[in-house]
């Protein structure tokens, strides 16, 4: 999904790559950046974000000013679902990441974007990781899904199938949509933490919106440099968890090896198409 920078824990990091959050070291400007991003997203997410995400914001009291102090955040999160947030210096190796998830620890980058990075940065920061991901971890069903994904990720390394499983994470945890009360809502962290994509994912005619299918999703390429051209829609968090837990991924990886990848924006005859996108946004960007 992303490229990590270091192959061994950098100075000051533990063997599992965790570091102290050192909350007191964040500057007033850094706290102000969190508040600016938080206010901007929360003003437009009601009616767009999944109910589980909005509940998580309230349960975890993320509306308090400033970057959350993990000592306080984790006390509430642990009581809700047994999860905790751990600070890391940046992107960590895949096996380390999966081990954290499998043990109900979510690694969060310990820095926040600069003003000139307000709408885009290559590496996820504390706002993306905590605002985008952690509210969903307060939901028991999604919390269990993330544990299952972490355990599955560790197993995938033995199959040489990491790039296939990464697509599941990308199209659910990062850029997933959910059907709620007859409408589409956002639950993916890459969307809820992005002002532009929170609108684009639901309102723009450009992207495809396709019903969730595990095999299809794990065949589908994705892009990391702009708004998505496909969004996959789950019917419920319970469905996502059940499919993940009940699937034997070994035979699935074998089957994936016999199938070609699906190009970005391609629609298959068997797809449950909710919205067939025009792909106009991607074409305009490609021609720019």
What annotation goes with each model-predicted range?
Residues 1-137, 217, 229-288:
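The feature captures two recurrent sequence modes
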Residues 116-120, 124-242:
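A contiguous, surface-oriented mixed alpha/beta subdomain in the mid-to-C-terminal portion of proteins
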């Amino acid at each position: 999904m992303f490229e990590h920078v270091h192959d061994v824990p950098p100075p000051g990091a533990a063997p599992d790559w965790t570091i102290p959050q050192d909350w007191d070291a964040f500057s007033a400007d850094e706290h102000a950046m969190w508040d600016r991003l938080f206010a901007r997203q929360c003003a437009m997410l009601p009616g767009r974000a999944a109910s589980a995400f909005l509940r998580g914001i309230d349960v975890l009291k993320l509306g308090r000013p400033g970057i959350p102090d993990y000592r306080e955040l984790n006390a509430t999160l642990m009581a809700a679902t047994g999860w905790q947030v751990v600070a890391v210096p940046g992107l960590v190796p895949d096996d380390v990441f999966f081990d954290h998830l499998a043990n109900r620890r979510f690694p969060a980058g310990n820095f926040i974007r600069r003003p000139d990075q307000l709408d885009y940065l290559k590496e996820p920061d504390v706002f993306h990781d905590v605002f985008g991901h952690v509210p969903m971890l307060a939901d028991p069903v999604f919390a269990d899904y993330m544990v299952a994904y972490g355990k599955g990720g560790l197993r995938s390394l033995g199959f040489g199938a990491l790039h296939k499983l990464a697509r599941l994470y990308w199209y659910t945890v990062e850029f997933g949509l959910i059907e709620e009360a007859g409408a589409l809502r956002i639950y993916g962290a890459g969307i809820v933490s992005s002002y532009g994509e929170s609108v684009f994912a639901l309102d723009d005619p450009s992207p495809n919106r396709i019903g969730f299918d595990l095999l299809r999703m794990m065949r589908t390429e994705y892009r990391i440099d702009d708004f998505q051209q496909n969004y996959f829609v789950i019917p419920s968090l319970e469905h996502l968890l059940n499919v993940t837990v009940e699937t034997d991924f070994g035979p699935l990886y074998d089957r994936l090896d016999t199938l070609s990848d699906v190009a970005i924006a391609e629609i298959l005859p068997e797809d449950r198409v909710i919205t067939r996108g025009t792909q106009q946004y991607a074409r305009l960007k490609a021609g720019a």
